[in-house]
Amino acid sequence: MKALWARAAAAVGGLEARLRSPRLGAFEPSRYVWSRGLALLCDHNGGLDFVRGQRGGRAALRFDPRAFESVRDGDLVWTRLIALPQFLEEALPRIAARFALVTGDEDWSIPAGFAGSNQLLESPKLGLWFTQNLDASGQHPKLRPLPIGLDYHTISNGPKWGHPQATPAAQEAELEALRASMPPNAERLPQVHADFHFNKHKQQVWGDDRPQVQRMLAGNPQVIFQQQKLRRIELWREKTRYAFVVSPHGNGLDCHRTWESLVLGNIVIVKRSSLDPLYEGLPVVIVDDWREIDQPNLSRWHAEHAGAFARPEVQARLTNAYWIERMRRLLAG
C-alpha cells in the first residue's frame, strides 16, 4: 500500500513541476491546495503584500489597480472576495483582455454575497469566474467552484492552535512527515472522527448550524467526538486513526476541515450543497441527512472509497497545481 502512495505522490510531483514559481521568501506557493497558494500561482494577484497581508476582521487591503493593466488573454487574475468592489471599479476598466477571475480567502458566498456580481459577470472581458463558496444561486455559465483548501496563512501570521508561528513551507513539511507515516485508510478504525464542535460559528448562514449537527450526532455510536482540544499536529495525528471525518458547513459553505482531512487520508462526509461538483472523483460522501451515518452505510462507503487515496488522480486533485492547470484548461475551452 505504501508503494501505491509513493507512485501517487510521484505522479502529482510531475504535474507540479510544470508550475514551479520564483521563490517568494517565507511566503511561497504550497503543494496542497491553499487559497493563497492559488493566488501566488495566478498570473496577477495584486502583489505579494496584498496576498499575504490581509487578516480577518480588518478593512480590506487595497491594491494598485495599475498592476492589472498588463493582463493578457488567457491569464488567471486573483483577488480577495472582500476586495471585489475595488476590483470592479478600478481594475476591470484597465483590463483589455479576456481573462479568468479567481476569488477566495473570505467567507462571502458568490454570487449572492457581492452586489456587483451581475455587473462583473456581464463583462465580455470575463471568460470564467472561479470562486470559493459558490452558492446555490450560482447558475451562471461563467461561474465555477474552487476549493477553500487548507489553512497555512493563520499560523504564518502568528501562533495559533498550540502551534508557534511558522511559514507555510514549514507547516507543510510537518504535514508531509505525518503523511509519510500514517496508516492507509483501509487499516483505520471504521468510524467517524468529529471535532467541528470546538468551532461553532455565531453568524453561520448556510446549512445546519453546528450545535444542531452536534446534537443530532451526539448519540451515534459510530461518531467519535474529540473530547478535548489538541495542538494542531496532534489533532492531525488523531484524525489519521479514523477512516472518516464529518465536516459540516462553517461560516462559509466550504470548510478547511474538508480538504485538510482529505490530505490526511480521511473519507469526508458532507451535507449536499452547491459545492457538490468539487467532490467529483474524490473520496467524499454526500448525505441529505446526518442520520444516514450508521454502521451499514459506513461499511458500504468504506468499501467504495478506502482505496481511492492510492489513485494518482485523487492525490493530484488535492494540489494547487491541479486547480491552476484546470482553470487554464477550462478558460482555453
Regions found by a protein language model. Name each.
Residues 10-252, 271-275, 279-286, 297-333:
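Nucleotide-sugar donor-binding catalytic core of glycosyltransferases
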Residues 256-260:
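A short, glycine- and acidic-residue-rich donor-binding loop in the catalytic cores
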Residues 1-3:
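Boundary detector for helix-to-coil junctions that initiate low-complexity/charged tails
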Residues 289-290:
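C-terminal accessory segments of extracellular proteins
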Residues 294:
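GIY-YIG nuclease catalytic motif and its immediate N-terminal context
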Residues 240-241, 262-265:
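Conserved donor-binding/catalytic loop of nucleotide-activated donor transferases
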